């Protein structure tokens, strides 16, 4: 996407302040502590990733779907819509916006049913409960909550340009790209511009690969290095949390603690 980020709705409406983000979460944080809340979002980012891969979507589409998912819950409690319904809805919408092509509703439902049964049976004892009408209704609600701001700028393009400018090899790009994917399991996509996220992921990759010669290159960048370090800390904290998390043992308990949507009134 080659448009001007700074003039986009992403820049002007969807780079949020951390205090505002935390304030919107207060209802959910009565039921879950902050680590548990992040684990729930790691899990559903994994769900979106698996569904996207089984649908053979490009990573750009999967990343956009994950950002939609996080944007929705940046303004809504988990009780407003079941995350298991919102996840495939975000994929459906992202595939349209990223011009991937139309995913048939029946195929999407079939993939969801298969993935829950084969990949996430440790989290859900029951079958995937939703049908096409639920996803289409949810899509309208999602569009409304996103204010129809559907263009998402990702860190992948600036990352490619940075690695090219640095003159480094494919190993660095491959690792940095994976770290960008992992960053979708944090709040950084809601708080920082994509070029800052790209720089932070590149910096982490350089440390892992012990590329000391790149320090001067980073020092000469015209960028807010304090912001970059905030992103680095958020991603490192993710890895610390991930390292000790026994997802298959814990996720059912965490999902049971999520506030549930109120049933509609009986007529």
Curated annotation (Swiss-Prot):
Record field: transmembrane: none
MF GO annotations: cyclin-dependent protein serine/threonine kinase regulator activity; transcription coregulator activity
Keyword Transcription regulation applies: yes
A Pfam family that the UniProt record links to this protein: Cyclin_C_2
UniProt cross-references to CDD domains, sorted A to Z: CYCLIN_CCNC_rpt1, CYCLIN_CCNC_rpt2
Cellular component GO terms, alphabetical: CKM complex; mediator complex; nucleus
Top-level division of the source organism's lineage: Eukaryota
Subcellular locations according to the entry: Nucleus
Repressor found in the keyword field: yes
Limits of the Cyclin N-terminal domain: 48-151
GO biological process: chaeta development; imaginal disc-derived leg segmentation; positive regulation of transcription by RNA polymerase II; regulation of transcription by RNA polymerase II; sex comb development; snRNA 3'-end processing
Keywords: Cyclin, Developmental protein, Nucleus, Repressor, Transcription, Transcription regulation
Primary location: nucleus
Role: Component of the Mediator complex, a coactivator involved in regulated gene transcription of nearly all RNA polymerase II-dependent genes. Mediator functions as a bridge to convey information from gene-specific regulatory proteins to the basal RNA polymerase II transcription machinery. Mediator is recruited to promoters by direct interactions with regulatory proteins and serves as a scaffold for the assembly of a functional preinitiation complex with RNA polymerase II and the general transcription factors.
Family, as annotated: Belongs to the cyclin family. Cyclin C subfamily.
Oligomeric and partner information: Component of the Cdk8 module of the Mediator complex, composed of CycC, Cdk8, kto and skd.
Name of protein: Cyclin-C
Gene that encodes it: CycC
């Amino acid at each position: 996407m080659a448009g001007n980020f700074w003039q986009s709705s992403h820049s002007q409406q969807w780079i949020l302040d951390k205090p505002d983000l935390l304030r919107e979460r207060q209802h959910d944080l009565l039921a879950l502590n902050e680590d548990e809340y992040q684990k729930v979002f790691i899990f559903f980012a994994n769900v979106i990733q698996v569904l996207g891969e089984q649908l053979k979507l490009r990573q750009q589409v999967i990343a956009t779907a994950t950002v939609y998912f996080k944007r929705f819950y940046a303004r809504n409690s988990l009780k407003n819509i079941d995350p298991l319904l919102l996840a495939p809805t975000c994929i459906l919408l992202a595939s349209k916006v990223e011009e991937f092509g139309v995913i048939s509703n029946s195929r999407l439902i079939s993939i969801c049913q298969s993935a829950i049964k084969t990949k996430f049976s440790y989290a859900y004892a029951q079958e995937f409960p939703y049908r096409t009408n639920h996803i289409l209704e949810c899509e309208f609600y999602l569009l409304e909550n996103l204010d129809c701001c559907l263009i998402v700028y990702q860190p992948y393009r600036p990352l490619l340009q940075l690695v090219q400018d640095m003159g480094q090899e494919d190993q660095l790009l491959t690792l940095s790209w994976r770290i960008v994917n992992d960053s979708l399991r944090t709040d950084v996509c809601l708080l920082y511009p994509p070029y800052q996220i790209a720089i932070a992921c590149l910096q982490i990759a350089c440390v892992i690969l012990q590329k000391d010669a790149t320090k001067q290159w980073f020092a000469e960048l015209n960028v807010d290095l304090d912001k970059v370090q905030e992103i680095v800390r958020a991603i490192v904290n993710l890895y610390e949390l991930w390292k000790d998390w026994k997802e298959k043992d814990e996720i059912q308990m965490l999902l049971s603690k999520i506030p549930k949507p109120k049933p509609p009134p009986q007529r």
